[in-house]
From Swiss-Prot:
One of its GO terms (biological process) is epithelial cell morphogenesis. Interacts with nonmuscle actin. This is Protein POF1B. Plays a key role in the organization of epithelial monolayers by regulating the actin cytoskeleton. May be involved in ovary development.
Length: 589
């Protein structure tokens, strides 16, 4: 909130008038200082300062302004500027009646001081009525240009467009001694209107004491003499002082304190309801802090014989004290609930961390088992591949042996066929020899023919013997080869039987390995399914550890973070989590 403050206090006494002194201003800063014609004196012992009145109101309220009697208004350069703002008077005919002071309200942009007509001037100095009081009034004008940042100050009771004047009147009362006459004192009221750029101060010198002047610097260096407004223009150039006498001490206006206390009470109540709302949002138990006889207790604490305004102010104060007590209890209960919820959260977090560590250990164990299963499966596949390759080699060798056996059988059948042909030829030759012998015996009977026949017979017999011997050798050779072939075939058949037996063993081992691989693949799929489904299905075999724990699903402290959080009282619903830990380890056969 940007505001401008102006204050002026003056202490005047009887004496000759000096020329008014113009106090220059320094821009963008406000300074309050004192000037004195002599050295600063120690504080007076017989002077008592008493705060008489404090009043606040909007800009449309009547503000008392004083000016010399029947004086014309002298417009200063300050009033002609565009930034000058005037007060708006609510009633132009209102007058404040006093035995010694007549104050009238005027139109905007005018300031008047009405002097009592009974006062006279008999000398160049002003004749002052003996009045043992000096009133010092202070005006503070605030111009709030924006709303306060706090959300508790925003509401229907805040009007950012109104300028508020705080009038602070301080009476300086001088104690009079019995043996000493009354020193004439003067009372002056200086009213500073909103946004003055230059403040002028006129001081009068007193023979007995020094004159102190307190001024305030504004923003612009424009200056005028306030003496033009307080002095009459005449030949003697005598300054007429205003003599103000009050009826007595002004009464304290209770409206300001009443409004202030009411505003504080409303803000205290809003704070209490805000705390109560937050306590309900986090799920705390709403305790009944209100007592039935609270109003009776407040009324009993108010003393009797006071005015209604004072009673109302005391009532506001007592209500604010009770509301502050309730707010304190609500804050303490809220902190206790938050501490309890944080304890629950910490316990749940520790249990979840422990479960997470156990699950990670179980998962690492299953990962090692899975790696062992994969290594075993890879070794089984390599052995199976080697066995299949050896089986293919043995089957190719068996096929080659069978082909050789078939070729030997074909050669043996050919040799038997040739042997039969040779026997048939032998029979034909014997038959032909016999026929020739019969012909020769029939036709020729001499010794030469007999010799020729013997010779031919011998020749044929030798030829037959040679041929028989040759054929016998060939038959023996073929038989030996056939026996050798039979032996080779029998050996090869034995090796084939060995191969067949070994092949049968390999096929049986392969079937066992296939069944083992199927079983391990099923277990592996189950393990993967358990890993993916987060241990929803129990694994077959092995040792299984089941851990059952209950966790709270509602945390009311989260209501402070989310507006749409719905609190469910504890104990109504809990979630049960079952943790299964399996320890299955495969051993290689």
């Amino acid at each position: 909130m940007s505001s401008s403050y102006w204050s002026e206090t003056s202490s005047s006494s009887c004496g000759t008038q000096q020329l008014p002194e113009v106090l220059q201003c320094q821009p963008q800063h406000y300074h309050c200082y004192h000037q004195s014609s002599q050295a600063q004196q120690p504080p007076e012992k017989n002077v008592v300062y008493e705060r008489v009145r404090t009043y606040s109101g909007p800009m449309n309220k009547v503000v008392q302004a004083l000016d010399p009697f029947n004086s014309r208004e002298v417009l200063s350069p300050l009033k002609t500027t565009s930034s000058y703002q005037n007060l708006v008077w609510s009633d132009h005919s209102q007058e404040l009646h006093s035995p010694t002071l007549k104050i009238s309200t005027c139109a905007p942009s005018t300031l008047h001081i009405t002097q009592n007509t009974e006062q006279e001037l008999h000398s160049p100095t002003v004749k002052l009525t003996t009045y043992p009081q000096t009133t010092i009034r202070k005006y503070v004008v605030q111009n709030p240009e924006q709303e306060p940042l706090s959300q508790f100050l925003r509401g229907s009771h805040f009007f950012p467009g109104n300028n508020v004047i705080y009038e602070k009147t301080i009476r300086k009362v001088e104690k009079l001694n019995t043996d000493q006459g009354c020193h004439p004192q003067a009372q002056c009221h200086h009213h500073i209107i909103q946004q003055p750029q230059v403040i002028h101060s006129a001081h009068w010198q007193q023979p007995d004491s020094s004159q102190q002047i307190q001024a305030i610097t504004g923003n612009n260096p424009i200056s005028t003499h306030i003496g033009n407004e307080l002095c009459h223009s005449g030949s003697s150039q005598i300054c007429e002082q205003v003599i103000i006498q009050d009826d007595g001490p002004e009464k304290l206006d209770p409206r300001y304190f009443g409004e202030l206390l009411a505003d504080l009470s409303r803000k205290n109540t809003d704070l209490y309801h805000c705390l109560l709302e937050h306590l309900q949002r986090i799920g705390g138990s709403k305790q009944d802090f209100e007592s039935t006889d609270e109003s009776e207790d407040i009324e009993s604490l108010i003393p009797k014989g006071l005015s209604e305004f004072t009673k109302q102010q005391i009532r506001y104060i007592l209500q604010m004290r009770g509301m502050s007590d309730k707010s304190l209890r609500l804050v303490l209960s809220t902190f206790s609930n938050i501490r309890e919820e944080l304890g629950h959260l910490q316990n749940d977090m520790t249990s979840l961390e422990n479960d997470k560590m156990r699950l990670e250990k179980d998962l690492s164990f299953k990962d090692t088992q899975l790696k062992e299963y994969e290594e075993l499966l890879a070794s089984v596949r390599a052995n199976n591949h080697q066995q299949q390759q050896g089986l293919q080699d043995s089957s190719s060798k068996c096929q080659a042996l069978e082909e050789n056996n078939l070729s030997l059988r074909h050669t043996l059948s050919d040799m038997e066929y040739r042997l039969k042909e040779l026997e048939y030829c032998k029979r034909n030759l014997e038959q032909e020899n016999q026929n020739l012998r019969m012909q020769v015996s029939e036709t020729c009977t001499g010794p030469m023919l007999q010799a020729k026949m013997d010779e031919i017979g011998n020749h044929y017999t030798e030829m037959v013997k040679n041929l028989r011997m040759e054929k016998d050798r060939e038959i023996c050779r073929l038989r030996s080869q056939l026996n050798q072939y039979h032996k080779d075939v029998s050996k090869r058949e034995g090796s084939c039987s060995d191969f067949q037996f070994k092949l049968h063993e390999l096929t049986s081992l392969l079937e066992e390995k296939d069944s083992l691989i199927k079983r391990q693949s099923e277990e592996l799929s189950k393990l993967r399914q358990e890993i993916y489904s987060s241990h929803n299905q129990p694994s077959t075999g092995g040792r299984t550890t089941i851990t059952t724990k209950k966790y709270r699903t509602q945390y009311p402290i989260l209501g402070l973070l989310y507006d749409d959080y719905e609190y469910i009282p504890p104990g109504s619903e809990t979630q049960t989590i079952v943790i299964e830990k399996t320890e299955d380890k495969y051993t290689c056969p």
